[in-house]
Amino acid sequence: MRVPVAVDDLVAPSTMGERHTVIDRGTSVAAVHTALPPHRYAQSDLTELIADLCLEPGADRALLRRLHTSAGVRTRHLALPIEQYAGLGDFGQANAAWLTVGLALAEEALSGALDAAGLTAADIDLLVCTSITGVAAPSLDARLAVRMGMRADVKRVPVFGLGCVGGAAGLGRLHDYLLGHPDDTAVLLSVELCSLTLQRDGSLANLVAGALFGDGAAAVVARGGDAGRRGAGWPMVAATRGHLYPDTEHLLGWRIGASGFRVVVDAGIPDVVRTHLGGDLRNFLATHGLVPDDIGTWICHPGGPKVLAAVGDALELPDGALDSSWRSLAGVGNLSSASVLRVLEDVATRCRPDPGTWGVLLAMGPGFCAEFVLLRW
């Protein structure tokens, strides 16, 4: 039976004291669960590992240590025990580790989310799986569907290439699907094992990535209308919007070659964020009768200190607005597409926004692009 959306949930008081309908239908987040590998290390330990793997013997390690100190990261989780990274001789070995470890983490994340939502794997109608740190055919989602006992008719959408924007974009695509299939249950699964993509060279981009990125997985269960949300502390998804910025392909992504995935990360990313993000986000909110001051909760992908600072500047956010993102960056690093989902889980379970609070979930990724998701608790 279709569960109707409560219209009052999607009506907001304007800043002028009037009331108006922001949007007439939505979908609901039923649960989010993050899974992290058990191998957790201090940033200082990872500094020495990366120096050993990436720098020439006897090379000055001062720049690397400065990068790691300024990254805003205290600890990270790795897919493998730290001593095993020296033995990863080629892309084939790294990708095999991605498949083995990634599948186990995916099952842990999805099982946790389903349990929290009171559902089973057989209840899933749509499974969207995003990862940019490994490849497989059959895809990871196909293997997981069989392993967890999903129905034979489950719809599967494996996604590669979204990178850090994948958590926000994936949640947006669940929303789009559920608007047309309001009786269904849809799942987003993010699996990112960034440490397995580390190259054995001292290029600046490789060292920057080695200072920021960690490993982990996250799963989101979503349903049509407000089914499963009441009393659980999870928000409604009211609307989404993406922005693709022309002539920015060079800013972020991979160069793929014989050694695997070589990171591309340009110093111009914060400038693009400061130039475009504020106006684009304000236009998105205005479409739904809102302004930034109406937003009580900001859930931002923790891309790094410079990116978070640029987001705060672009949106003119008050001090503390991005505390959950900074906390996630410090605790686990940048988990690529899984990061913003971990922040969403933290906000919902630790911060517990009051009913009626508006939120914005946002992330940026290769393209260069941004994705906005409007939430209501």
Curated annotation (Swiss-Prot):
Pathway: Pigment biosynthesis; melanin biosynthesis. Its EC number is 2.3.1.233. The active site is at residue 164. Pfam families: Chal_sti_synt_C, Chal_sti_synt_N. It catalyses: 5 malonyl-CoA + 5 H(+) = naphthalene-1,3,6,8-tetrol + 5 CO2 + 5 CoA + H2O. Keywords: Acyltransferase, Melanin biosynthesis, Transferase. One of its GO terms (biological process) is melanin biosynthetic process. It comes from the Bacteria. It is an enzyme of class 2 (transferase). The keyword Transferase applies. InterPro entries: Chalcone/stilbene_synt_C, Chalcone/stilbene_synt_N, Polyketide_synthase_type-III, Thiolase-like. GO terms for molecular function: acyltransferase activity, transferring groups other than amino-acyl groups. Homodimer. Involved in the biosynthesis of melanin but also various secondary metabolites containing a naphthoquinone ring. Catalyzes the iterative condensation of five CoA-linked malonyl units to form a pentaketide intermediate. THNS subsequently catalyzes the dual intramolecular Claisen and aldol condensations of this linear intermediate to produce the fused ring of 1,3,6,8-tetrahydroxynaphthalene (THN). Belongs to the thiolase-like superfamily. Chalcone/stilbene synthases family. PANTHER family: 1,3,6,8-TETRAHYDROXYNAPHTHALENE SYNTHASE, HYDROXYMETHYLGLUTARYL-COA SYNTHASE. This is 1,3,6,8-tetrahydroxynaphthalene synthase. The gene is rppA.
